[in-house]
Amino acid sequence: MKNSSGKIPEGKSNVSGMKLALSNGATWTSTADSFVNNLTLANGGTVNLAGDAHKVNVLNEMTSNDGVVATNSLDSKVEIANNAKKEVKKLTVKGTGAMADAIAKDSSVAKKLANVVTDASGKSAATNVTTDEGEVAGAYSGTVDANGNLSGSLAKNTTNENISGLGVISLMTWRQENNDLNKRLGELRDSKGQYGLWTRMSRGEAKYNDLGIKNQYNYYQLGYDARISDDWILGGAVSYTDGESSFRDGDGTNKHTGFAVYGSRLADDGSFIDIIAKYAHMKNEYDTYAGAGDGDYSTNGFAFSAEYGKRFKGQNDFWIEPQAELTYGRVDSANFTTAKGVHVHQDSLDSLVGRLGFALGKDVKAGHVYVRASYLYDFKGDVNMYMDKDGAADSYDHDLGGGWWEFGVGTNLNLGHDTHFYFDVERTASGEVSTPWQWNAGIRYSF
């Protein structure tokens, strides 16, 4: 009997002189004790040992050239009889994801999987051993030598590696909310009132290409400040971020609710200092069809930044403004359990970003236009996540540290004596995380 596509009926086979040939992905699903006289597997031809533990005996001859024996039980067997010929060039025994998790906590399970197919001497007749991905562990891949010795390893679980990107998203979005004085408040030099009320919105996209993560976000901020001296302005703001992320094997949402206090000094010589402290409560939720399963958690973020710059006036209303900024941010650790019962711990995340840049602008009748460029470097940026369930455990590490460039163009427009509008677009180049686009728009009213 030959079969190059489709299935042989499930169940017990007691046919005298039975010759079974499976090729090109054809599958025989066996659910009870069976035998064949001759078994030939080629090009993905598969014997699927389904159901409860049982045995398939090969009585005369087994030939395999890229054949597969798949099993959902370590107690199911394919046994090549004493007098049978064995011509195995390549034979893969494939186990389930649950077996991968079992191997993660006890490596000897891999040998048991290899021994699902044995020859007359009791040695494994397989040349390769693989599994699907588990809930915690990645897929196992091993090879069996001529003496029946097995060597192999577990890969990282690709779905869980993407889930570990939640920490990446947390740091990405928190770092993305860092902003200099001009992004937040526009051109304060044109604001002459004692008090200021302002609001702004940013929308953008951030990518972490190592995991195929994309996060699109909307950031809203509402603030109020007061002039406490000729040079200093003191204020506060509330903010809300709403983000939607996608990654291989899943998607998610991230929401931040926070507040900030700030102080800004604008001196007569063109120099300025801007200091801001921020807090946010962060909620993350994701859905995925594999790996550790769906999950959600919340944590807190803190940040403190200080910026210094000075504007130098040139001819024909042109000016240049060198800037330097240092921002420290932290996202607290988090613990949660997924829908599949996997325990997850995310370490606290630290970011220390230094920025050196400049803005080159021109005063126009309605306000100012400018271009800007900065180089930023995160001296920290490590993201670490740990997962475990029933003794199987793994960890995932990502490094968002290093440098990148930021480029932007924008304008500040005086809509009236008391009202100012500001708009800015930017993108980044290089770095572990990229921002293909972001725009920022705000309006400030002084009184």
Segments and roles (model prediction):
Residues 60-61, 108-124, 219-240:
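Short, intrinsically disordered, low-complexity segments enriched in Ser/Thr and Pro
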